[in-house]
Amino acid sequence: MTSSSGSLKLEIHTDDKTPGKWSVPLGDDVFRRFLSGGGGSEKAVFGEGSLFSPFLFGKYFDPSDAFPLWEFEAEVLLASLRSLGQCRVDWSQTDQAYVLKSDIPVVGKNNVQVYVDINGRVMEISGQWNSNKKAATNSDWRSGRWWEHGYVRRLELPSDADAKYSEAFLSNNDDYSFLEIRIPKINSKNKF
């Protein structure tokens, strides 16, 4: 996982009123059938070590459910993936900020978006990887079987995270994009 110069600063959205977004849960058995029947794109997006893999944290966890990431040490949760060389994500915190870094496979449109629900204290990272498969008419792809069209990882924000000053950057190479998100702490003197 490497960062390169020439990063694109992503807009962090705060007003997303998509009805029914992430309302269809991705169950363990559904995910296993989906992944076993899929091709290389599905495995690149949802495979071992990916930020969007339901098995990223050692056991199954639906990525559309908010996870309290910063309550855990990356070294502990990712130890087995790191020992196998399959880890493409990392997170940490300093006195000033919370930081998330992740490789994101370049598949399909790869339109990574970051949303923050300031009141609900949740950050979500999502994007559409399969624009060829049509969602139901008059429906947003995130409102149905979202995993057939895109990906998501929802994260609970710590109580001292100042989400309104968050920054996200994306840099690209041939096979992966590198995403870095920085969320300052409320009492930090250094807002980005």
From Swiss-Prot:
Main location: cytoplasm
GO cellular component labels: cytoplasm
sHSP domain boundaries: 80-192
Keywords: Cytoplasm, Stress response
Location relative to the cell: Cytoplasm
Pfam families (UniProt xref): HSP20
Similarity-based family: Belongs to the small heat shock protein (HSP20) family.
Assembly and interaction partners: May form oligomeric structures.
Protein name: 21.7 kDa class VI heat shock protein
Organism classification: Eukaryota, Viridiplantae, Streptophyta, Embryophyta, Tracheophyta
